[in-house]
Amino acid sequence: MADSAALLVDHILPPVDMRQWVISFPFQLRFLFANYPAVMSKVLGIFTRLISTHLIQKGGAKHSTARTGAVTFIQRFGSALNLNIHFHMLFIDGIYIDGFNKEKQVFKRVKAPTTTELNALVHKLSQRVARFLTKQGLLVEDIDNSNLTLDGLAPDPMQDLYGHSITYRVALGAQRGKKVFTLQTLAPQIEENSDSQVGSMAGFILHAGVATRGNEREKLERVCRYIARPALFEKRLAITGNGNVRYQLKTPYCDGTTDYRRSHVIFTPLDFMAKLAALVPKPRVNLTRFFGVFAPNSQYRITITQEKKPKSRMTSDKGDKWDKTVKEKRQSMTWAKRLKRVFSIDIETCEAC
């Protein structure tokens, strides 16, 4: 988490305005993405092109002369350890246009999206995803409604775990099929009107309320650490007196059946392992994607990103930095460096000296 955030801030993300876009999907699509990673990648491409077009048009430019970029983290988990595949995208909050010599890229910031624009984007996304799934033979539409057709899905023992995890139900044991037990320990909370930028339609929910300025590098790193966080936090785990697993929710929620908010979920040990198994992606599925100017093969990556290559090994004034072996370059940060980077705790310096 800390390594990924440091890599993005130090070497990839330029010192310009950035915005986090978060898109979540209906339950049926979450199940589809878990079983068909290739379909998930196609839908991610549809969403990326949609936001890119929105930014370019809002900046008053064309695709031929303007470009943008994004770093996407595909998260598979919800706050209750449920399977919830959704996308966290760090988009450049603007566009890059060609300069006078067409070699230097000039950044142009765009205004923050309004709620009306977010709702329009969600509507377009749902339509394009529906068209794509129909062409793939995965969606059958009639006059009344649309239904996913998963008849050709190859048998997989994980499908049962996926379905129960997505719908917050017990997957294994004597309580199989029942709702996961929750504790109601917090009093009702009066919800105030929020100015957060959210658009929603038919199970699609789009958030775009978190943004950073070009000079807010520490805030950007906190956002990166948040979207790169792991699924499980050990400090929220506890064992109950009867041997079950209790997991504390970061944000208590109300499911509508009672005014009291639910603060914990309870699993049997067997069902807890089933929940963790459902969060593991299929082999060779990359959960971090780079698009636009951040793509590995983009001709603009070297001129826009923070990472600069030396002209030669001899001209670098930091010779030892470029003389590192491949193994040394791939090593993670030490715990001492992580403490200093994340919590500003320098254990290598004595305060009494």
PLM-predicted stretches and their roles:
Residues 1-353:
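Beta->alpha loop/short-helix hinge microenvironment recognizer with preference
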